[in-house]
Each structure stands twice: as structure tokens, then as C-alpha cells.
């Protein structure tokens, strides 16, 4: 059973930067855990807004910050070759330090909201956002992370930064990672490396690999959408947040 929600555009301060955010929250008065929703390379588009609303309907305050605020304020693209090209260019202009800073600022903003339980923080991200939330899972405030098909976690970072896998020893919460076995951007060796690192550092985790599913399988606006895999993954996300965020 889902709850009634309301949505609004918000501004998240981070020093001199004003980050645009999409906020979805239950209408009923109360206190709720918060889940930060992290975009793909395409910005906070209609799919990410929809996911933010779906999370809120499960009884969470959900916020999607604009990760490209520094590079391209208001950037939003669809799933076209042009959108992919534009999104990838912006991804390469980011920095891990700035991303972490903006994520921390979003969490800090959420913790000031009167209907948020400040100790109950979760993350969910897709595509580039899956990469970002693995990095973000290293923040001490984060209790639960759902990372969807984040390419490059073991070996890629913008500029000269270390890849997210090098932060695994700092992860204190529970992490679920979701991959499609048909996703050529994430070789099986990468997912095995992620699993080995999580096991080595005794991170509470589960890795889910979906046969027949490709990159972007959770997004119903993509040609690669896989309804069966998406439905199963959503149930696991709900289970994760229900268990870890009280």
C-alpha cells in the first residue's frame, strides 16, 4: 500500500553553489527516513522524477539533486544518441570530490526538513548514479544504498581521482548492487571485483545479476527496459529500505 505524496522543486545550498532538487514527500504529517535519488547521465529527467515519486509513495522523503548543476544547470535529456553524447561529456567534467560534496550537502539539507528522521539516510542511483551512490555509500551517515548498473566502479573516475571501489573499506551501511548480464558496459569481471571488495571489507551486501537484462533495464523509457527484472529489483529495493531505514 502506497501513501499520498506531494512534490516540489527545491534549492539545496552548498557553499556558493545552489543545487536544484526535486523533492517528493508523503502528505501525511510524520517523520520519515530520507532517500537521495541519483540521476543517470541524462539529468533529473522524467524517469528520475518518477523514481523519486515512487520512493516517496513507499513512505520516504525522496530528493533528486541535479548532479550536473556545476556544469550545466537545468540539464535534462531523453534516451537518444544526442542525449547520450551530451550526458557523457558532462559526466567526464565532474569530479569525485565535488560529487561527494554535493551529496553531503543534499543529505544535510534533507536532515533540516521537519518531516525527516535525520539518522535514517538511504541512496539509490542508476547508470552514472549507480557509480555515484557506491562512492556515496562511503559517507558515514548512509545506512542503505541501492546501486543500479554503475559502470566503472572498479576502475574509472573523472580526472585523477581514485575509483569508487577504493572507498569500499569506508562503507558502514548495507549495499545492494543490481546488474544486467547482457550489459556490455559492465563485464562480469567488474561485478566479481565489486563483490570481492565488499566481502573483503565485510560490508553487508547483496549482488543481483539478471539474465537477459541490459544496461538501463529498470528504466521504462529505454529500449532496454526489462519489466520482469525491474519488478524484481524494485521489490529488493523496498526490502532493503524497509529493513535498514526505520
Curated annotation (Swiss-Prot):
Pfam family, one: DLH
Keyword Transferase: no
EC number: 3.1.1.45
MF (Gene Ontology): carboxymethylenebutenolidase activity
The protein's enzyme class: hydrolase
Catalytic activity: 2-(5-oxo-2,5-dihydrofuran-2-ylidene)acetate + H2O = 4-oxohex-2-enedioate + H(+)
Name the record gives this protein: Putative carboxymethylenebutenolidase
Native organism: Synechocystis sp. (strain ATCC 27184 / PCC 6803 / Kazusa)
